[in-house]
């Protein structure tokens, strides 16, 4: 058995697809009308459909998991993030961990937590 995909719930699937493409270069593989499979194993799921599947409320900014990306030139990434999405909500701005890794954390358009760090 292997882990195949990570699914996140989004309110506006097209805006989210554009967000992940703009910042991370992730492209669309398959559009299933409310469910988009992207490269890198990321799946975007329309919130209305997901609520219907589960019968439960969606909790934005639950901080219970994060999508983690590595970026060699994190300063250039932050410039791009601030230019393209100036109103993004940060959890922590650029910081350096005691082991030397530089990271930034922020929410995507739907409150899914993202971390971008330099390679370890």
List each model region and its residues.
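Vicinal oxygen chelate
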Residues: 3-11, 36, 56-120
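Short beta-strand-to-loop elements that line the ligand-binding cleft
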Residues: 8, 29, 93-96
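Short loop segments at secondary-structure junctions
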Residues: 11-13, 41-42, 47-48, 71-74, ...
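Short secondary-structure junctions
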Residues: 25-30, 87-91
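Conserved short beta-strand elements that form part of the metal-binding/catalytic scaffold
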Residues: 27-61, 113-118
């Amino acid at each position: 058995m292997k882990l195949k995909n990570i699914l996140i719930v989004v309110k506006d699937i097209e805006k989210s697809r554009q967000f992940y493409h703009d910042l991370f270069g992730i492209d669309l593989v398959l559009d299933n009308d409310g469910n988009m499979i992207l490269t890198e194993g990321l799946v975007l799921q329309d919130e209305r459909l997901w609520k219907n599947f589960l019968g439960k409320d969606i909790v934005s900014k639950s901080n219970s998991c994060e999508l983690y990306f590595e970026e060699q030139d994190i300063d250039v990434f932050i410039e791009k993030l601030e230019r393209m999405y100036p109103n993004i909500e940060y959890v922590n701005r650029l910081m350096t961990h005691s082991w030397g890794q530089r990271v930034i954390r922020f929410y995507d358009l739907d409150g899914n937590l993202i971390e971008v760090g330099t390679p370890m």
